[in-house]
């Protein structure tokens, strides 16, 4: 965000914001959060995975969110940013287990000696378990774990109340909307969006720090859009079914006709989630 001074000891980086072409860049997301953009751009990961380095000004402890892909150069860049000013990484947190967020976690733990925490025990290293509502502390910088299932069953967000910021992983993206994965649930996702919309008011959120894409400076407006978009898509799916579509692929051809065909497989996954949600008795 504009206007935040750079702290001493931190390598110079640009602010994370939409570039001229609407893409994210590495740098400061809020006073206590920096992004290191991973070199894994794709239609699904947008500009790449945002690895977040969280630290209280002047503190010696750092928390890192989503080390990202198992890319040695990227992981060492994160180490450089995190260890500036004689700081050390004391915790690693995964917003969910997808490989673009978690594949580098084991190697990053080797480089830093820090444990890896996640809601799903399968992704933990060093027995770092926690539940929704837990408060994580890194040198006085507190983040509250918010369970945000939907994109995946194990998705979480992190409330950085001191900055009015929410780290959203893939629950809310910096550009476009997210896909409901095979282990996710649209019903859970809709409830999550409603809960985050309430949190935006209750916590006075000023910025969303996503797992992909640039930061979002209007949390309430973004969440209102996400909720409206999901409801509109459900209405479109209902209309496609009424018009005779019977399979997810047929629904995609109607509902996502304006979407690049390279994204249709992902759209088909979302349609499956929508059909499950609309099924009688669901």
PLM-predicted stretches and their roles:
Residues 22-82, 142, 157-169, 174:
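Conserved beta-strand hairpin/beta-sheet module of binuclear metal-dependent hydrolase folds
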Residues 1-16, 21-25:
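Actinobacteria-biased recognition of intrinsically disordered, low-complexity terminal regions
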Residues 59-64, 69-71, 142-239:
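Metallo-beta-lactamase
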Residues 42-48, 67-144:
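Active-site HxH/HxHxD metal-binding segment of metal-dependent hydrolases
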Residues 113-120, 167-169, 261-263:
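Short hydrophobic/aromatic-enriched beta-strand-loop microsegments
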Residues 95-101, 151, 212, 274:
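Histidine-centered divalent metal-coordination motifs
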């Amino acid at each position: 965000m504009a206007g935040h001074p750079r702290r001493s000891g931190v390598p110079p980086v640009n602010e994370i914001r939409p570039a001229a072409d609407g893409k994210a860049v590495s740098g400061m997301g809020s006073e206590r959060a920096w992004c290191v953009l991973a070199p894994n751009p794709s239609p699904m990961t947008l500009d790449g995975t945002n690895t977040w380095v969280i630290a209280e000004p002047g503190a010696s402890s750092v928390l890192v969110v989503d080390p990202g892909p198992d890319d040695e150069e990227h992981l060492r860049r994160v180490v450089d940013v995190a260890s500036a000013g004689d700081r050390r990484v004391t915790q690693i947190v995964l917003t969910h287990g997808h490989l673009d967020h978690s594949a580098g976690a084991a190697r990053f733990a080797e480089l830093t000696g820090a444990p890896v925490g996640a809601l799903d025990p399968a992704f933990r290293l060093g027995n770092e378990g926690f539940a929704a509502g837990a408060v994580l502390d890194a040198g006085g910088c507190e983040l509250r774990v918010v369970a945000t299932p939907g994109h995946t069953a194990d998705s979480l967000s992190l409330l950085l109340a001191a900055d009015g910021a929410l780290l959203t992983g893939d629950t809310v993206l910096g550009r476009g909307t997210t896909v409901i994965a095979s282990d996710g649930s649209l019903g859970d996702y809709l409830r999550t969006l409603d809960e985050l919309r309430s949190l935006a008011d209750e916590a006075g959120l000023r910025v969303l720090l996503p797992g992909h894409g640039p930061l979002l400076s209007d949390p309430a407006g973004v969440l209102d859009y996400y909720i409206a978009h999901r409801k509109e898509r459900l209405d479109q799916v209902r209309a496609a079914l009424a018009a005779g579509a019977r399979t997810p692929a047929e629904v995609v051809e109607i509902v996502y006709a304006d979407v690049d065909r390279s994204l249709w497989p992902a759209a088909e996954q979302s349609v499956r989630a929508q059909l499950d949600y609309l099924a009688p008795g669901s």
